[in-house]
UniProtKB/Swiss-Prot annotation:
Its main location: plastid. SUPFAM superfamilies: Terpenoid cyclases/Protein prenyltransferases, Terpenoid synthases. (2E)-geranyl diphosphate binds at residues 242, 279, 283, 414, 417. One of its GO terms (biological process) is terpenoid biosynthetic process. It comes from Nicotiana langsdorffii. The gene is TER. Belongs to the terpene synthase family. Tpsb subfamily. Monoterpene synthase (TPS) involved in the biosynthesis of monoterpene natural products of the 'cineole cassette', volatile compounds present in floral scent. Catalyzes the conversion of (2E)-geranyl diphosphate (GPP) into alpha-terpineol and, as minor products, sabinene, beta-myrcene, limonene, alpha-pinene and 1,8-cineole. This is Terpineol synthase, chloroplastic. Mg(2+) 2 binds at residues 279, 283.
Length: 522
């Protein structure tokens, strides 16, 4: 038996159950609702200039409170789309372009014709053009990032610069806004916004209250899934596997933080925890014969295949079977959930066969399997049934065949995972990842391979943007947002290495800030 050499969890059951949050219950709701009504009046106030409205919407989004004002925001953006005249500044044009695209409005890259070349000294405009460029789709050459990135890097070398702009530039170059996890961005931006001279006290108070109230709801979700995880006994009986319940819950906040989706977060945390455990059965524990038997049992959903397996592998099977029966209150859903889990386990088995035979697949072979083995299809199939009401027959067809929205989200998750984890996994003796496959196939250095993977991520984001913009799919908006948020969460979790299995300090700090530390009142 191999060993994953994983560290124990940092957050045990007793710690999670002991967490107290002052913002639970209705204590602060009266003040919050008052602030919300005042904010609605401000958003819809007559006489505001177009740019002022766009800046307010941008701040609402970055502070994490725009979901309270969806109707008002769409009303303003619809009006801007219909009646807007070309802006004379690069900054205003780029902000308008990004916000309209984010909200599903068709807006052409031609809006920038003649602007970008004449505004190279407008650093704020260049920053907003850089951020807008990440909403590009394939073939939109006007929105290439290279020259704006070069300009922004040069700007940071200057001594006498606007420190607020410099912070935003540095953050954008580290990871663009479109790729960032929404709730972490809100946590950071609240601190940034608090120090701005144009800060609106009403909006700041609303954002802080909202963050803390939502955080309290998340903690209740976490306590629930911690009790479930303890009851499964998997952490104790699978000592070779990653015990990462809090990290698994952290993923679900990235996918959908909205307080009313607590049930979805609880179910998706269970999905993530079972995926992590079963992944480690294939990667670390099982022999090839055992893994073949386990896969056969999953494929047939028949316990006869389990007879010769170790008890802890049987335990995994029964935990998964119990979970599917718990979730699928509608019998029609069961085949779709089982198919997704079967596809996942079959992809794990392919990787196990490569490992035991010491085979290095071609890049194409690897990628054809790896976008499934990263588990995004399983996660998103469950997400659909948790969001869609009623279920759409056409959507079920696209779901079973993994629509491009699922496929591109999965591919970003896979590639980001490979960038963050491949070094550690090779030390453990894992199957080669995309980096090693590309190095072997193209005879290039590791850094060249990593650069190629980064390029693939950028190109895949363009495809995901395109899939998001296409109206001809039967999925609810919230499902499409969840797929995009899963890709964002991948960028977050693997930005500084293996944030899921490795428990690096950056991920620990992010989890603490998001789950366990409230923001003090302004």
């Amino acid at each position: 038996r191999r060993s994953g050499n994983y560290q124990p969890t940092m957050w045990d059951f007793e710690y999670i159950q002991s967490i107290h949050n002052d913002y639970a219950g209705d204590k602060y709701m009266k003040r919050f609702n008052e602030l919300k009504e005042e904010m609605k009046k401000m958003i819809m106030a007559e006489g505001s200039q177009e740019l002022e409205k766009l800046e307010l919407i941008d701040n609402l989004q970055r502070l994490g409170v725009s979901y309270h004002f969806k109707h008002e925001i769409m009303q303003i953006l619809s009006s801007i789309k219909q009646h807007s005249t070309p802006a004379d500044s690069l900054y205003a044009t780029a902000l308008k372009f990004r916000l309209l695209r984010e909200h599903g409005f068709h807006i052409s890259q031609e809006i920038f014709d003649g602007l970008s070349e004449t505004h190279t000294k407008d650093t704020k405009g260049m920053l907003y053009l850089y951020e807008a460029s990440f909403l590009a789709t394939e073939g939109e050459s006007e929105l290439e990032q290279a020259w704006t990135e070069k300009h922004l890097r040069e700007y940071l070398k200057n001594k006498n610069i606007d420190q607020n702009v410099a912070k935003l530039v540095h953050r954008a170059l580290e990871l663009p806004l479109h790729w960032r996890m929404l709730r972490l961005e809100a946590r950071w931006f609240i601190s940034f916004y608090k120090k701005r001279q144009d800060m609106i006290p009403l909006l700041l108070e609303l954002a802080i209250l909202d963050f803390n109230i939502v955080q309290a709801a998340h903690i209740q979700d976490l306590k629930y899934v911690a009790r479930w995880w303890k009851e499964t006994g998997l952490a104790e009986n699978l000592p070779f596997a990653r015990d990462r319940l809090v990290e698994n819950f952290f993923w679900t906040i990235g996918v959908n933080f909205l307080p009313q989706y607590g049930y979805s977060r609880r179910i998706e945390t269970k999905v993530n925890a079972l995926v992590t455990a079963i992944d480690d059965v294939y990667d670390v524990f099982g022999t090839l014969d055992e893994l073949q038997c386990f896969t056969d049992a999953i494929q047939r959903w028949n316990t006869d295949e389990l007879d010769n397996l170790p008890d802890n592998m049987k335990m995994c099977y029964f935990a998964l079977d119990d979970f599917i029966n718990e979730v699928a209150c509608d019998a029609l859903i069961v085949p779709y959930l089982r198919n997704a889990w079967t596809d996942l386990c079959k992809s794990y088995l392919i990787e196990a066969k490569w490992y035991f035979s010491k085979y290095i697949p071609t890049m194409e072979e690897y990628m054809d399997n790896a976008w499934i083995s990263i588990s995004a299809p399983v996660i998103l199939v469950h997400a659909y049934f948790l969001i869609a009401n009623p279920v759409n027959k056409e959507a079920l067809h696209y779901l079973r065949n993994y629509h491009d929205i699922i496929r591109w989200s999965a591919l970003i998750l896979r590639l980001a995972n490979d960038l963050g984890t491949s070094s550690d996994e090779l030390k453990r003796g894992d199957v080669p990842k995309s980096i090693q496959c590309y190095m072997n196939e193209k005879k290039v250095s590791e850094e060249e391979a990593r650069q190629h993977i980064r390029l693939l991520i950028s190109e895949t984001w363009k495809k995901l943007n395109e899939a998001h913009n296409v109206a001809a799919h039967p999925f609810p908006k919230m499902f499409v947002k969840s797929a995009m948020n899963l890709a964002r969460m991948a960028q977050c979790m693997y930005q500084h290495g293996d944030g899921h299995g490795g428990q690096n300090s950056e991920t620990q700090n992010r989890i603490m800030a998001l789950l366990f530390e409230s923001i003090p009142p302004a």
